[in-house]
Amino acid sequence: MGGALQWNYSPQNTIIDTTGEIRWYMLPETIYSFDNIWYGGTMMGFRQEADGAMSWGYGQRYAKYDIMGREIFNRRLPTGYADFSHASKKIESNGHYLLRVASDGYKRPDNKIVRTVRDVVLEVDGDGNVVDDFRLFEILDPYRDNVLKAIDQGAVCLNIDPAKQGKTLTAEELAKQDQNDHFGDIVGSGAGRNWAHVNSVDYDETDDSIIISSRHQSAIIKIGRDKKVKWILGSHEGWKTPYQDKLLQPVDKNGKPIKCEGSKCEGDFDWTWTQHTGWKVRSELSKGDVIYISAFDNGDARGMEQPALPEMKYSRAVVYKVDQKKMTVEQVWEYGKERGHARYSPVTSLTEYYGDKDSSMVYSATAGAEFDWKTFSYTKFPSPVIDEFKWLAKEPSVEIILHGAEGYQAFPFDVKKAFHP
């Protein structure tokens, strides 16, 4: 029962230059078919690797091609795993890949057999053999429902349902899902539902750990090879034993603890809410016990609630400094709060640091969109925004606006590396 097999959108992948000119686009017909289970699915998780080629995944496959269309590999997911989406990460030290997938045929504690939803990180070697997996429904608490009850049911990643716009779930509705065997790509608690919605995975080579972003727990979480949680960057509400001693304590720039009540903290510090791309900042700053984390804070259910007016919502890019020994977190940079609802991007988006330029890229995927929920159509199409910031700068050095467009994520593409790796 369940799964996210129906998550299938025709791919539109393009490279543009800084003047807005299209320089390359993918012709996917030879590797993609909307009507074929094994060749359908939403293409996501694009990354340019050190050799200049791009890797990504879609549906029941993960692939790697160079910019001229030469296949390096295009493989089905191993048996027992299904429904790739959102994220892949190559471990440069050994050539392994981390793929965000799901478990196919998981037997729950109540003996119900389900296909889980966006809650497994699979590790495969360079030949596609299974090395390890992180079954998050066993590592985390799939019944922590604080965020699930607060998020807007009308917009969950790329799933948009006009009938549910502005609505939230109750504890009673969540409980009935188990009673009614209601499984699948739906917001809900427990394995077999979209309780985690992991949308990014990173690897920390210093301690052989993964870092995940869980949209539906509004948390960025580090997990060791032993499958034990190392720390949780997110609101402290709803976490039970044994997770309570893994929660990071907010501090100011002087190391003084910041007081939080519920999910709201004093001063400018804030957690991320339904965030994307919780990634390690790979620079000289991240060393020893200190690690910097960047994220795109989408901002739905901020403070574990819906605001009085939808126009009060905003998104932001944010960078945190985590002291893994002291178990503290300091917010060192944010951008977007001052732009207000005009830059609000409730779904997708990205924040990422690039060491070659010592800068951060921010992609606001659905900024500027206005939607008529009665006709289920845009009254104003999104205008995604690409910003580049010098490290911790208050204003962007570069800003590109894609008028009347849609796109899941974006990243800088190195043409020289593509042709001269």
For each predicted feature, which ranges?
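Histidine-/acidic-rich catalytic cores in large beta-rich domains
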Residues: 1-421
